[in-house]
Amino acid sequence: MSDNPEMKPHGTSKEIVESVTDATSKAIDKLQEELHKDASESVTPVTKESTAATKESRKYNFFIRTVWTFVMISGFFITLASGHAWCIVLILGCQIATFKECIAVTSASGREKNLPLTKTLNWYLLFTTIYYLDGKSLFKFFQATFYEYPVLNFIVTNHKFICYCLYLMGFVLFVCSLRKGFLKFQFGSLCVTHMVLLLVVFQAHLIIKNVLNGLFWFLLPCGLVIVNDIFAYLCGITFGKTKLIEISPKKTLEGFLGAWFFTALASIILTRILSPYTYLTCPVEDLHTNFFSNLTCELNPVFLPQVYRLPPIFFDKVQINSITVKPIYFHALNLATFASLFAPFGGFFASGLKRTFKVKDFGHSIPGHGGITDRVDCQFIMGSFANLYYETFISEHRITVDTVLSTILMNLNDKQIIELIDILIRFLSKKGIISAKNFEKLADIFNVTKKSLTNHS
């Protein structure tokens, strides 16, 4: 039986199965190699082309970003030299653009198409708020002109009440515009609008006050934020290892602290450059002032050198018991500290807002940079702090001719103004500034004026 050839197929079948399995495995491996080779040959050229295109795109974006950076810097300094009025116009333009971008990011445009009053109400509340906040600060520069026209004088004198009435009209308009099915969106939009008004328009108003207090208090905070942003990036890419905050993964602790050092150094340098110019340090009394105007004033004491006594330990080691320095340098270091440790959180807040609504930039108004908001997100919080710091530690609250005139025109009637002028003339006559002959002539004029006012009343 064992010699029968028909009894051997069992062993032969096993060998056949093994050989077929090996051949199949080899064929599959070879096929996979060929497919992988074909795939790599077909993908490689595309990858190279896409890499080249990416590099070209980055170069182009860098070029555009650089060009527009110089355009913005040049425009900023031209505006600065043009005068305080143009700086205020720049701030107003930035706050309006920022408001528009923030509202656009946080609003559902598809639903707004069915609610046209939503956009109208947003803009109405914006200009009402600007009129309320900035109107009072700017009216004083045109007080004498407004007084000549009864309507304008009424608007200036009753500014707060008029603003309240305007806001009340907006409130009524909002309630009348409510529609079923859109209530959640409409109330949400109203809340967002008020939040943006608070974070943008109110803080921009404080920056405008910085301009009126002296361009130094506008220029230095802006410069410190820019320097901090630059060195946070440079220190971050050079030394950065520790992530600073979850919402901005690229921000590092090393960049944050390194920028603090360089911003403090920059504050000393910028103060040294800016403080000698009275055009920058003097409060403005005439909005027609520009760089070529001879703007002079009695300098705030912080811009004047003062003697500071050093602790005895310094005298023992270096034989120096006092130093003479302008106090503004110490204040500049305080501003630099805020610009480094707190102002960046304005940018982090903006980053969180963009992530919430899944957008890369707030807009495309500045090629290569994004929107206006992307560039000024830290400036608002810095500017508001600078104003509060100035009012708390720097301002002397001096009484100027403009403030006295504003008080007189807003609170006295015509008869009281005539009486005030009469008293002032008598005072100047007693001091010998007005001669007796001129005093008699002026007295006659005022007596006639008083009689005419009495008859008219």
UniProtKB/Swiss-Prot annotation:
Reactions listed under catalytic activity: a 1,2-diacyl-sn-glycero-3-phosphate + CTP + H(+) = a CDP-1,2-diacyl-sn-glycerol + diphosphate
EC number(s) reported in the record: 2.7.7.41
Pathway where it operates: Phospholipid metabolism; CDP-diacylglycerol biosynthesis; CDP-diacylglycerol from sn-glycerol 3-phosphate: step 3/3
Cofactor: Mg(2+)
GO biological process entries: CDP-diacylglycerol biosynthetic process; phosphatidylinositol metabolic process; phosphatidylserine metabolic process
Annotated function: Supplies CDP-diacylglycerol, which may play an important role as both a precursor to phosphoinositide biosynthesis in the plasma membrane and as a negative effector of phosphatidylinositol 4-kinase activity, thereby exerting an effect on cell proliferation via a lipid-dependent signal transduction cascade.
Keyword Lipid metabolism attached: yes
Residue stretches spanning the membrane: 71-91, 154-174, 188-208, 214-234, 255-275, 330-350
Family, per entry: Belongs to the CDS family.
Activity-pH behavior: Optimum pH is 6.5.
Keywords of this entry: Cytoplasmic vesicle, Endoplasmic reticulum, Lipid biosynthesis, Lipid metabolism, Magnesium, Membrane, Nucleotidyltransferase, Phospholipid biosynthesis, Phospholipid metabolism, Transferase, Transmembrane, Transmembrane helix
Organism of origin: Saccharomyces cerevisiae (strain ATCC 204508 / S288c)
Protein name: Phosphatidate cytidylyltransferase
GO molecular function: phosphatidate cytidylyltransferase activity
Membrane topology recorded in Swiss-Prot or TrEMBL: Multi-pass membrane protein
GO cellular component terms, semicolon-separated: endoplasmic reticulum; endoplasmic reticulum membrane; Golgi to plasma membrane transport vesicle
Classification lineage: Eukaryota, Fungi, Dikarya, Ascomycota, Saccharomycotina
InterPro entries (UniProt xref): PC_trans, PC_Trfase_euk
Pfam families: CTP_transf_1
Assembly with partners or alone: Homodimer.
Compartments, record wording: Endoplasmic reticulum membrane; Cytoplasmic vesicle, Secretory vesicle
